[in-house]
């Protein structure tokens, strides 16, 4: 994140630890009652998401990659203001979920306040409790990692699980996906910056 509120975003979905299992699953039609998408369907879905993101004002340099050898996918883009990333989330959410309403804001940054917020407005607890035990197993070994890099110096973070880099220019929050799904831990974080 640049001091003026512009920056770069990258989302990485790394399933490489499950590569052997995913190779087997990819040869099946269904698993645990869920249809298994083909590689072509997955590539098409990422291409659709890329197009949706690219249509968002203030967003540029949109790129998606899908690696079926290592099972790593990524989406990256450049934004003119942090609020443009909120628009990206709303646009993708609307395209994928129809009439369901996306949160208005998950990121907040005002250059004058020197405070960056990653809000935790998603709740998966009800959906998680409805999952089969086989589906719930996925969450036990999955992790969520958020790394934020800044031009300014990090002086404080609100989430006690956050680690700040020795340079004071980056933070990392790594949580078990099960703890997030059951709301034992939060991805919310207020990061205070200074010049």
Cite the ranges covered by each PLM segment.
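Start-of-domain marker
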Residues: 1-58
């Amino acid at each position: 994140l640049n001091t003026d509120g512009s920056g770069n975003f990258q989302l990485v979905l790394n399933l490489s630890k499950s590569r052997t299992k995913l190779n087997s699953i990819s040869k099946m039609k269904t698993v645990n009652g869920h249809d298994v998408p083909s590689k072509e369907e997955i590539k098409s879905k990422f291409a659709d998401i890329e197009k949706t993101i690219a249509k968002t004002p203030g967003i540029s340099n949109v790129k998606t990659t899908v690696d079926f050898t290592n099972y790593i996918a990524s989406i990256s883009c450049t934004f003119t203001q942090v609020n443009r990333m909120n628009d990206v989330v709303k646009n993708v959410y609307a395209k994928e979920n129809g009439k369901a309403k996306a949160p208005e804001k998950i990121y907040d940054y005002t250059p004058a306040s020197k405070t960056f917020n990653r809000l935790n407005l998603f709740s998966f607890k009800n959906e998680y409790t409805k999952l089969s035990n086989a589906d719930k197993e996925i969450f036990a070994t999955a992790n969520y990692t958020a790394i934020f890099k800044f031009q300014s110096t990090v002086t404080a973070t609100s989430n006690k699980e956050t680690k700040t880099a020795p340079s004071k220019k980056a933070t990392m929050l790594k949580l078990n996906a099960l703890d997030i799904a059951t709301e034992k831990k939060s991805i919310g974080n207020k990061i205070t910056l200074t010049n």
